[in-house]
């Protein structure tokens, strides 16, 4: 049975792939769950159009990611204000949310907190630090910030 996948299926393919599967697997699992549609000439043309649109969107996303990377690398004066003890140690640690808010406050681009890669030894004292921000697949930017007492 020839099917077009509408979602990623483990050990079979990703959305848009045309696959050949056994009749029972297609009828009893893939089609009822909406993971695939029958491969008709009209559906194949429709999938080709969707793939072209996805490729164009991926190119736009990549261009946008490069712009965000340039903005982040040019950004200066990012300060994370946190409560500290007299010795300069933080009550807790700096989290990804804090960094994202500080970047936004410094005039930088909006980032997703999941894009920030915090070091294994958490930021627990005042000073200057640097973390990575995974903006897009294959595009990583360094975010420099300073932790100051609030």
From Swiss-Prot:
Entries under HAMAP family matching the protein: Ribosomal_bL9 (MF_00503)
InterPro entries: Ribosomal_bL9, Ribosomal_bL9/RNase_H1_N, Ribosomal_bL9_bac/chp, Ribosomal_bL9_C, Ribosomal_bL9_C_sf, Ribosomal_bL9_N, Ribosomal_bL9_N_sf
UniProt-recorded name of the protein: Large ribosomal subunit protein bL9
Family stated for the protein in its record: Belongs to the bacterial ribosomal protein bL9 family.
Pfam name, any one: Ribosomal_L9_N
Organism: Corynebacterium efficiens (strain DSM 44549 / YS-314 / AJ 12310 / JCM 11189 / NBRC 100395)
Biological process annotations from GO: translation
Gene designation: rplI
GO cellular component: ribonucleoprotein complex; ribosome
Gene3D superfamilies: Ribosomal protein L9, C-terminal domain, Ribosomal protein L9, N-terminal domain
Keyword terms of this UniProt record: Ribonucleoprotein, Ribosomal protein, RNA-binding, rRNA-binding
Entry's Gene Ontology molecular function annotations: rRNA binding; structural constituent of ribosome
Main function: Binds to the 23S rRNA.
């Amino acid at each position: 049975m020839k099917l077009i996948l509408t979602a990623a299926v483990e050990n079979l393919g990703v959305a848009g792939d045309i696959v050949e599967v056994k009749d029972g697997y297609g009828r009893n699992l893939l089609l009822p769950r909406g993971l695939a549609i029958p491969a008709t000439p009209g559906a194949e043309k429709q999938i080709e159009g969707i793939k072209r649109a996805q490729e164009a969107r991926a190119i736009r996303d990549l261009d946008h990611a490069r712009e965000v990377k340039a903005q982040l690398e040019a950004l200066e004066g990012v300060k994370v204000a946190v409560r500290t003890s007299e010795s300069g140690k933080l009550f807790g640690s700096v989290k990804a949310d804090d960094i994202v808010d500080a970047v936004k406050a410094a005039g930088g681009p909006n980032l997703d907190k999941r894009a920030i890669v915090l070091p294994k030894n958490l930021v627990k004292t005042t000073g200057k630090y640097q973390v990575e921000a995974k903006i897009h697949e294959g595009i990583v930017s360094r975010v420099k910030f300073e932790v100051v007492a609030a």
